[in-house]
Amino acid sequence: ELSCASNSDELLLQRQQLLASGKDDKGGVLRSRIHKEQRQIAIENFDLDKANKVLDVLAKNDTWQIPTLTLNTASKRRPFATKEWQESFTYLPKNVQEQWLNYINNLKKTEVTPFNEKYSKWMFDMTKRVHDKGIKIMAGTDTPIYFLTPGRSLHEELAVLVEAGLSPLEAIKAATKNPAEYFNLENELGSIAKNNWADLVILDANPLVDINNTKKINAVIKQGNYFDRTQLDLLLDQLKTTK
């Protein structure tokens, strides 16, 4: 986003100064400071010609992308307000629930800002541009940032990738075949084949018709061990009661 701004050279100089002055800070703190000071300015000064040049370089260099759309649109979409998220929240350790609730209750008191809306749209548009340029995409969530729960957040990421313009099959590949290819593990992961890892999710409905069908899990095969729906529900119940 910073390289796609009309004032990218100015932002780069400022960023170098921020990095120099914050050399003793933790990486996460420094990254957040840069985002806070530069992200909105960069988006307000978005330059399509510059963006296309950046994307051309990424495509030429075969630089794969992980949009983390669920995370980068969370300030607008507020996933923690949904029923599905609230269900997944109950499986987290109690101390994590308590810590998150303090932040969430404060967030609920704030309104979605015009910039939240604009940045969310920018992320969807840019992900589509990345896809249209033929740049490989992988699915990632950066859980637990912004209260994204493990497991559920990946299903959500597949859905928003489709919303951004990928087909359901392309979204599924972004979470399976593409990462295996990126890490040169095609002969072990990412596809159903003899001698590959026996890690599978069996669904009750076709995700190519509706990507949200990835959540309709009938059974899981993990390292060759079969868990039907009853066994999966039992594991979830145990998780709730043993934290």
Write out the residue ranges for each language-model feature.
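Divalent metal-coordination and catalytic microenvironments
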Residues: Q65, D142, L161, A171, ...
